[in-house]
Amino acid sequence: MIDNDKTHFDAIVIGTGFAGIYMLHKLRNELGLKVRAFDKASGVGGTWYWNKYPGARADTESFVYRYSFDKETSEGWDWRNRYVDQPEMLGYLQAVVDRHGLAKDIQLKTGIDSAVFDEIHHIWTLTTSTGELFTARYLVNAVGVLSKIVIPQIPGRDKFQGQIVHTGAWPADLSLEGKRVGVIGTGSTGVQFICAASKLARHLTVFQRSAQFCVPAGSRQVSEAYVAEYKNNFEQIWDGIRNSRIACGFEESGVSAMSVSEEERQKVFEHHWEIGNGFRFMFGTFSDIAVDPAANQAASDFIRAKIRQIVKDPETARKLCPTDLYAKRPVCTNDYYETYNLPNVSLVSLPENPIKELTANGVLTEDGVEHKLDLLVFATGFETVEGSYNQMEIRGRGGETLQHHWKDAPSSYLGVATAGFPNMFMVLGPNSAFSNLPPSIESQVEWIGELIGWAEGESTPVIETTREAEEAWTATCKEIAAYTLFPKVKSWIFGENIDGRSSRVLFYFGGLAGYRAKLREVADADYEGFILHSDPSSMVA
């Protein structure tokens, strides 16, 4: 006999990273609902649980890569470095869980295989990887933007006698000491791993798929005075973050690059190069790096000049210089280009010399050279946004799967709901704000909580968005993206890191402040674009 007290909930949350932890707290502790959160991992942390690779750390500053809702934990947490590393990040998130007593309502080592909406009883039925069944009135997906790893298909994988790993599924006991290591990928993760691995491996071979614009991170230990200043100005700092575009805690420039002299531009670029941070360099130098070709060219030329200045071997420097626009997600780490001056580091440019196959001993490139390896690391990223959902079978009205609903491209209304899937919400769903993630997560969690709280007060069992609202939001996001330079470069932020997949808009590029204003506008209009009703058989408008 099923014990409904243990298997039925007001809400179920999938995921226990930044989004899932706060969502559980919001629904349980603030709204008083009966909630259970599930995670396939054996600990909380989401992407920060899985990404244990050497060098793993945030590339947004520590004081803003955290919650603002939990001032007490932040004030009691004296971080050591400008950028929090993976172990410290897990410690912080666990401290939040402990402070708010959330552990008793988190079920770990339990993935969700399916979620099906029952139109008669208007509840979600979930099947877990452990064979259990649970039901809930509300389903909140907090599964993350970057969860499902991507490993490119390379001939000969079954021949390789060494070890193959992905940075997003790093074994805790894996050491690089004394090993010949190869790495494919030079994105945000790749540059961090390369710099760390160069200090540990006997030899490191970097297989570069595309050259990367990388600025220094300015990583360093922070002083007690630095931490104290943040704590003393907590509210003011967070007010500025919420009312900014990128939400990274620095002053975003309002000056056009071409409105100043060449001498002044170089001074500004040099100043921000010395301070460090990728988002700061793109958005703190000038206001139009991401939208104006001339401004973008100026920034690109500056970084390319730095590469040629830093890298001693001219041929290596040539390979490291990007030839496209500076319009991918900004990347930063300390000493990236300096790493290629080390005697134990070599670079292979895959556009010029592709991988032919893996052999028993390593990687064979088209020039006939066999690069002998003990370990091959894929820093090749994730299936952005939709990958997390593709790992589950989610069925809404009429039995339609989410995969079918998103067959052309993932879409949503405001990044939080999709038509035909009543009482299902998403944190960081498709076309959420392109910004520092924790402030964006908080904005959505708080808004979803307000919507559910409002519906509970109205005794309304069903909340769903309309197709018209979803289509209009998708069109808005496409229009804003087209105004920027980002779509002009092949990148994971448009899902183009998946073989055979065409470009699709996955983010709202209008800034966090603009996004929050839209959320407030919709709420103030009695949640315009949503239908709240008691008839579960009602058709979506």
Curated annotation (Swiss-Prot):
Highest taxon of source: Bacteria
Positions that bind FAD: 39, 47-50, 59-60, 65, 112
Key word Flavoprotein present: yes
Disruption phenotype: Disappearance of all phenazine N-oxide products with significantly increased phenazine non-oxides. Exhibits some antibacterial activity toward E.coli and B.subtilis, but at a much lower level than the wild type.
The EC number(s) this enzyme carries: 1.14.-.-
SUPFAM superfamilies named in the record: FAD/NAD(P)-binding domain
Gene Ontology terms: biological process: defense response to bacterium; phenazine biosynthetic process
One MF annotation (Gene Ontology) recorded for this entry: NADP binding
Gene3D superfamilies: FAD/NAD(P)-binding domain (3.50.50.60)
Residues reported to bind NADP(+): 57-59, 186-192, 209-210, 492
Pfam families in the cross-refs: Pyr_redox_2 (PF07992)
Annotated site residues (Transition state stabilizer) in this chain: 329
Co-factor(s): FAD
S-S bonds: none
Keywords: FAD, Flavoprotein, Monooxygenase, NADP, Oxidoreductase
Reaction(s) catalysed by this chain's protein: 1,6-dihydroxyphenazine + NADPH + O2 = 1,6-dihydroxyphenazine N(5)-oxide + NADP(+) + H2O; 1,6-dihydroxyphenazine N(5)-oxide + NADPH + O2 = 1,6-dihydroxyphenazine N(5),N(10)-dioxide + NADP(+) + H2O; 1-hydroxy-6-methoxyphenazine + NADPH + O2 = 1-hydroxy-6-methoxyphenazine N(10)-oxide + NADP(+) + H2O; quinolin-8-ol + NADPH + O2 = 8-hydroxyquinoline N-oxide + NADP(+) + H2O
Cited InterPro entries: FAD-binding_Monooxygenases, FAD/NAD-bd_sf, FAD/NAD-binding_dom
Entries under PANTHER family matching the protein: DUAL-FUNCTIONAL MONOOXYGENASE_METHYLTRANSFERASE PSOF, L-ORNITHINE N(5)-MONOOXYGENASE-RELATED
Job description of the protein: Involved in the biosynthesis of phenazine natural products including myxin, an N(5),N(10)-dioxide phenazine antiobiotic, which has antimicrobial activity. Catalyzes the aromatic N-oxidations of phenazines, such as 1,6-dihydroxyphenazine (DHP), 1,6-dihydroxyphenazine N(5)-oxide (DHPO) and 1-hydroxy-6-methoxyphenazine to produce DHPO, iodinin (1,6-dihydroxyphenazine N(5),N(10)-dioxide) and 1-hydroxy-6-methoxyphenazine N(10)-oxide, respectively. Also catalyzes the N-oxidation of 8-hydroxyquinoline, but not 6-hydroxyquinoline (6-HQ), quinoline, quinoxaline, quinine and 2-phenylpyridine.
Family as reported in the entry's similarity comment: Belongs to the FAD-binding monooxygenase family.
Protein known as: Phenazine N-monooxygenase PhzNO1
Higher taxonomy: Bacteria, Pseudomonadati, Pseudomonadota, Gammaproteobacteria, Lysobacterales
Gene, per the UniProt record: phzNO1
